[in-house]
């Protein structure tokens, strides 16, 4: 614990593990199973409970509550965890819950993520790296969020939804279906409004890759053939385009929800349905 500073008003329970150069601010409460890695900073009134791991050099602001029991009536009080990666910024009032013993039992957040004020990550979610939750963005239980996703302020995501990497959800949207990689969704209920072009450019995709994705998505939601045939056509036509295959593979994996589609498309479509 070399270089670690704990304010005299903070409560760090016996058993908690603190790394080096950790700062624990006034009135924080750290539970006995918490693990705080090197270089983390907790401002004032932060609560970290349960088997929660906070990755190195992460910063948590006032009144954030991490690792409390899941809001899941099926949870029976069993051993579950919350794991947060390194270099994460967790702003005021953010809440993240541990997994539930009726499911995978783990809530996982990747590295280099930003959670703005009052964002919420529910039980059994899996959030990738370099993800941004704007103010009041909320995801329900069992949601999967890919790398480099941005969720706009005041937006909510239904339980079991999958969000592909580099996707973008506009502010004050309600996403109830799976969103393809690179997709942009807006509205209540959110519809696919095109591709996240800015995100693709930031990811280093070349112009030809962006054009291929645009054409592939147009083919997928053309509605002239059964959806399964469209998926197979795109897979064959763009067999050498990794970015397109990312979208195809995401669709073929098929989660528990339907897909977020354009406004004119059937918003309950699944790959195994005509």
Swiss-Prot record:
Pfam family, one: Acetyltransf_11
Known pathway: Glycolipid biosynthesis; lipid IV(A) biosynthesis; lipid IV(A) from (3R)-3-hydroxytetradecanoyl-[acyl-carrier-protein] and UDP-N-acetyl-alpha-D-glucosamine: step 1/6
Domain of life: Bacteria
UniProt EC number: 2.3.1.129
CDD domains: LbH_UDP-GlcNAc_AT
Key words of the record: Acyltransferase, Cytoplasm, Lipid A biosynthesis, Lipid biosynthesis, Lipid metabolism, Repeat, Transferase
Any Gene Ontology CC annotation: membrane
Listed PROSITE patterns: HEXAPEP_TRANSFERASES
MF annotations from Gene Ontology: acyl-[acyl-carrier-protein]-UDP-N-acetylglucosamine O-acyltransferase activity
Predominant localisation class: cytoplasm
Function: Involved in the biosynthesis of lipid A, a phosphorylated glycolipid that anchors the lipopolysaccharide to the outer membrane of the cell.
PANTHER family for the chain: ACYL-[ACYL-CARRIER-PROTEIN]--UDP-N-ACETYLGLUCOSAMINE O-ACYLTRANSFERASE, ACYL-[ACYL-CARRIER-PROTEIN]--UDP-N-ACETYLGLUCOSAMINE O-ACYLTRANSFERASE, MITOCHONDRIAL-RELATED
Similarity section: Belongs to the transferase hexapeptide repeat family. LpxA subfamily.
Complex and partners: Homotrimer.
Full protein name: Acyl-[acyl-carrier-protein]--UDP-N-acetylglucosamine O-acyltransferase
The encoding gene: lpxA
